[in-house]
Amino acid sequence: MTSVEPNVYDPQQVESAAQQYWDATRAFEVDEASDKPKYYCLSMLPYPSGALHMGHVRNYTIGDVISRYKRMTGHNVLQPMGWDAFGLPAENAAIKNKTAPAAWTYKNIDHMRTQLKSLGYAIDWSREFATCRPDYYVHEQRMFTRLMRKGLAYRRNAVVNWDPVDQTVLANEQVIDGRGWRSGALVEKREIPQWFLRITDYAQELLDGLDELDGWPESVKTMQRNWIGRSEGLEIQFDVRDVDGGVLDPLRVFTTRPDTVMGVTFVSIAAEHPLALHAAKNNPELAALLADLKQGGVSEAELETQEKRGMDTGLRAIHPVTGEQVPVWVANFVLMGYGTGAVMAVPGHDQRDNEVANKYGLPIVQVIALKDPRSEEERSWDATRWQDWYSDKSRAFELVNSAEFDGLDFQGAFEALAERFERKAQGQRRVNYRLRDWGVSRQRYWGCPIPVIYCAKCGAVPVPEEQLPVVLPEDVAFAGTGSPIKTDPEWRKTTCPECGGAAERETDTFDTFMESSWYYARYTSPGARDAVDKRGNYWLPVDQYIGGIEHAILHLMYFRFYHKLLRDARMVDSNEPARNLLCQGMVIAETYYRPNPDGSRDWINPADVDVQRDERGRITGATLIADGQPVVVGGTEKMSKSKNNGVDPQAMVGKYGADTVRLFSMFAAPPEQSLEWNEAGVDGMARFLRRLWAQVQKHAADGAAPALDVAVLDASQKALRRKTHETIGKVGDDYGRRHSFNTAIAAVMELMNALAKFDDGSDQGRAVRQEALQAIVLLLNPITPHASHTLWQVLGHGETLLEDQPFPQADAAALVRDALTLAVQVNGKLRGTIEVAADAPREQVEALALAEPNAAKFMEGLTVRKIIIVPGKIVNIVVA
């Protein structure tokens, strides 16, 4: 036995001993040379921000419980860990701390690795990597050059947020009220060249593949379906005339509502559209608007909520049915990067167009009337008062004011207009997707260099594979007003691999979603020359993936896309990266603050607050420990730096031990729901572990337990043994099928309570107690592995890896009851209970029920019509 003082539960001593044993035996390093079925359990890798938070602890504890359970059920389990190490926070921290992003990142990795190890996770650390290391990102550089050659990576202009003071591109979240988060300067929209991956080529496959992901939450699949956004419609051509009547390039618009085309009264185009730029050349007022619209962010959400603005360009579009001219407007809600950068405006039946038309006095025409109006309001149509039915194609309607198309419903109008436009070469049926190609360029330093060389003669040339990786210099002076590699001619200047002439490297770096889109595959093939080798097909797909639902769209979409790229590169055989997905809920905690005179709030950490509660545990007041004065209770919210309501996991581990923290994080809520951090609850888990420790020590102090002989057990011994095996069955189901760890713990607690009441020092009493305690130790092992490691030894076993012990199996014979308690009902109402032998004949059960004293009172003077017996549960006597 490792050196542990057995009589006192000292978490630090117990946990240190267990971790030393696991390290010495390399307990959780695995390979493919196993005859056991494989199981790959993966929690989303962390960003090395500096310290773990409770969200990390919950995420990785869930994964660890599943991993340890699966190993105990006979699986070859892989649970790896790495670091999503590139990204903007490192640049921000470098500015703040006057250091290089690399130094800050590696320091954080070292600290967080120590924190993770202190929690005792069953991780194969031999597979660890950081995505900022060249031996990792070389593989995505190689993949990118191959995608370039296949035409799946391409370069085009795209609009970005530009900070004119810091001379840098800003992410959408760095634009606050239209200004740069650091400089405060008004942000401009600027069009610059960007690299893209053709994820849209995989749109239909990504959509269809969701139907095969039975182990993914429906909510995630629904979000992905909506994000992919498959829609069937028509692409319609509008010819365009210049201010002087000259013919310009036609506009093409995609619409899912061609039935409303007769309601088009103008066409809207993006401020960056070539026709807008053309019209602005001789229109100073329009040019000023275009310049103004360059200010502010470029996110779709921002454009959706801002005030609608626009201006007539003077250009005219020719209506494809009537031949009438309609004005072409620039509008701030049309994005050049979405579709064609132009939309047909139907203000009678599109709310956004309706706002613009009413604001600027543009015509509004009704072309749809309901067949089934449900109210007087729905029988009328008012251009100035929007009603939802105006745009609801699910309602039964017919076309009006639509010439030869009057009276048609949606499908009839769709088919008639499609046939007309295709016959006249004015349009065609199209399947469109909301999904856009993945822009992977970032005008930042701390990221993977994009492996492209620019040559005046040869253009954009992929870096030859033998010259990879293109290594990012780490020892740089970083001020935050530009990328060090852009200003470093020694790094930037190179020779063209095709013609040998002078050339320059691409100074953009990859979006960090690139690194996190394929990391799961690299874990399977450490040291492989390519991204993945044959070991990938042994481990993949991931059997259980764990992470927050906030990643449902971006990460989990790119994760699935990159897997298909790996498949098409013949590196993996599977179509999807993960069979099952568990999205854990947030960790929330109380917030406390003091208001300031200017209306702002000083948020106070819960550790600095003394809380008063009533007998039901509800907060009745709170004071600041430092001065004893009241603070305001702000309610429970997600743990965050902004609300200063985070709880330091390291402090909790130091105070209570890792097993207690793990136990509380699994007990407080089901994995998918929010977990409210409550230190009183943590203290309760600590008391539970101390009780378990004391029970095992007390039992062991009486010496080795005799062998169990089930044939001679008395009723109380059978009852405890039955409870033990009922618990084994429930906990195994909760772990394996339901991932309901809180109810598994509750079941073990019930067994502990039964054990505490079991006062039997006989040989078979001690044998039954030994079986129960061994079961508890093994059942809790996935959650409290350190305590279980020592307690297993206290129960008379040698030091061993409990994950290699078989998970307990319920003995069906132990579940059989000698006697049953049945409820007695009279006309369906409970009137009493009876005790019967488990094998009692029906006649005996009926007689005992009829004789039950309280039930008999309700049958006086009445005739028994029927007796219904639900075996093992109820006897219902029907009287009249």
UniProtKB/Swiss-Prot annotation:
Source taxon at top rank: Bacteria
An example Gene Ontology CC term for this record: cytosol
InterPro entries recorded: aa-tRNA-synth_I_CS (IPR001412), aa-tRNA-synth_Ia (IPR002300), Leu-tRNA-ligase (IPR002302), Leu_tRNA-synth_edit (IPR025709), M/V/L/I-tRNA-synth_anticd-bd (IPR013155), Methionyl/Leucyl_tRNA_Synth (IPR015413), Rossmann-like_a/b/a_fold (IPR014729), tRNAsynth_Ia_anticodon-bd (IPR009080)
GO BP annotations, alphabetical order: leucyl-tRNA aminoacylation
Keyword Lipid metabolism: no
Record EC number: 6.1.1.4
Motif 'KMSKS' region: chain residues: 638-642
N-terminal signal peptide: none
Record GO terms (molecular function): aminoacyl-tRNA deacylase activity; ATP binding; leucine-tRNA ligase activity
Protein location: Cytoplasm
Binding residues for ATP: K641
Reaction catalysis annotation: tRNA(Leu) + L-leucine + ATP = L-leucyl-tRNA(Leu) + AMP + diphosphate
Keywords annotated in UniProt: Aminoacyl-tRNA synthetase, ATP-binding, Cytoplasm, Ligase, Nucleotide-binding, Protein biosynthesis
Chain positions of motif 'HIGH' region: 46-56
PANTHER family in the record: LEUCINE--TRNA LIGASE, MITOCHONDRIAL, LEUCYL-TRNA SYNTHETASE
Family: Belongs to the class-I aminoacyl-tRNA synthetase family.
Protein name per UniProt: Leucine--tRNA ligase
Biological source species: Stenotrophomonas maltophilia (strain R551-3)
